[in-house]
């Protein structure tokens, strides 16, 4: 547990550093005049700018997790042309490999332009299908999520610095170690989110820069992270009785499946999504048991059940 806590703390530090690097990189680039004009006019305030940066960081985190778990390209086509093209030219992993090398002084912006195309893969059905992928149709990769940032410029060296902050941490002995994103869970990303609630974004114009300072944003906005123990209790007290009631009233396998997929779990202020994912997992476990008829369903059946539950039952 202590080791996991240290890794989460290191990741949170890396996210904070990446936010500062990218925030300053975008507004300071000579080609980002439109972004600076929107900030100077008040059309884009510090909180709105910060939210776009957060979405960008969580795009990176999402893709790093998905790529390491080999979830981007369907298993049936893994190793094929689509997999090779995505891995070589569109993945965040190829940026992580670049960031492991010397990159200082690279003032080009082609890597950021390439990332914009990567983001299109996950929001545009036509573009995604051309690569054998599926668009996510979610807000994280939506056109408005990072609109001002996608229209701005970022130098390669600064982008790679930020990617390295997200990719590598130093152990207590000072040894560089790669973050194992395949092993991260929502609790880890939630811990990062919790730490970010403490900060207030600051934009400076001369010279253009972005910073995070400790503030009272959490108290003022009512933003709070739900700890794992409380999530566990909420699931057991509020959701499990409903699941058991629905299943007990169903007469056969088909009715049980329909009853479970008919559940609706809503959290308008889902934040990191910790509670919602825990709810989805609990319903999915019951659904996979119903489908397979075994108390310990296979991973494949569980994953399919989880996908169906998230599509049908979860609203956030």
Q: Can you say where each PLM-predicted feature lies in the sequence?
A:
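Short mixed-charge
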Residues: 247-259, 287-309
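Preference for the N-terminal adenyl/adenosyl cofactor-binding alpha/beta module
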Residues: 1-284, 313
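Conserved AAA+ ATPase "SRH/arginine-finger" region at the nucleotide-binding site
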Residues: 316
């Amino acid at each position: 547990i202590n080791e996991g806590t240290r890794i989460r703390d290191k990741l949170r530090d890396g996210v904070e550093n990446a936010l500062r690097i990218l925030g300053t990189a975008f507004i300071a680039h000579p080609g980002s005049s439109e972004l600076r004009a929107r900030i100077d006019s008040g059309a884009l305030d510090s909180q709105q700018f910060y939210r776009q940066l957060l979405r960008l960081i969580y795009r990176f985190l999402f893709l790093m997790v998905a790529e390491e778990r080999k979830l981007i390209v369907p298993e049936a086509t893994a190793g094929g042309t689509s997999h090779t093209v995505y891995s070589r030219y569109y993945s965040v992993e190829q940026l992580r490999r670049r960031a492991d090398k010397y990159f200082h002084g690279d003032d080009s912006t082609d890597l950021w332009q390439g990332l914009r195309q990567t983001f299109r893969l996950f929001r545009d059905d036509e573009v995604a299908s051309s690569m054998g992928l599926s668009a996510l149709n979610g807000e994280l990769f939506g056109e408005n999520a990072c609109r001002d940032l996608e229209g701005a410029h970022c130098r390669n060296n600064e982008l790679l610095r930020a990617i390295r902050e997200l990719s590598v941490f130093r152990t207590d002995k000072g040894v560089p170690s790669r973050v194992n994103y395949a092993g991260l869970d929502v609790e880890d990303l939630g811990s990062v989110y919790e730490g970010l609630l403490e900060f207030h974004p600051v934009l400076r114009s001369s010279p253009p820069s972005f910073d995070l300072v400790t503030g009272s944003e959490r108290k003022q906005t009512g933003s709070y992270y739900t700890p794992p123990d409380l999530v566990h209790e909420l699931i057991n007290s509020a959701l499990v009785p409903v699941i058991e009631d629905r299943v007990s009233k169903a007469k056969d396998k088909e009715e049980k499946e329909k009853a479970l997929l008919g559940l609706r779990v809503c959290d308008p202020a889902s934040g990191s999504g910790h509670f919602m994912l825990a709810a989805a997992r609990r319903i999915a476990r019951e659904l996979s048991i119903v489908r397979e008829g075994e108390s310990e369903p296979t991973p494949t059946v569980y994953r399919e059940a989880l996908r169906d539950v998230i599509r049908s039952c979860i609203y956030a």
